């Protein structure tokens, strides 16, 4: 999701690539039911300390702002209205980033969602993450100290 499209619902995904066969496998994200979807910006893949066949995947999710709407609206209209409201909020507030944590078993075709980490005062504009092998912590960078403002689009062009 670009700096000018902080309201788009993320249709991104995580995939594996097997260089010996040239096969790309789009992984199903089990247990990840965010209405804002996944908009991966950066990620780290770390071998598990408890199982040699398991990986922990940390993903920066540059998701749009959360919008609660009247559930009595018909589904098609509700989604259109949600995107319209999210677009307006994104221009004022910027994206609502998170760090998503998944587990992956080698050779599998899915990842299991473990956690969503977010804090509007700390997870401000992350663009890189380095996860811990135990799946319980990570380091991440915030190259910009704010989510919106007149200077942000200019900084975003250089990051």
Question: Which positions does each model-derived feature cover?
Answer:
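Asp-box/WD-like beta-propeller blade repeats and closely related beta-sheet repeat scaffolds
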Residues: 26-135, 141-149, 153
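A short loop-to-beta-strand structural motif that recurs across blades of beta-propeller domains
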Residues: 2-15, 98-100, 159
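A generic structural micro-feature
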Residues: 6-9, 91-93, 154-157
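Surface-exposed loop/turn elements that mediate protein-protein interactions on large endomembrane-trafficking
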Residues: 16-23
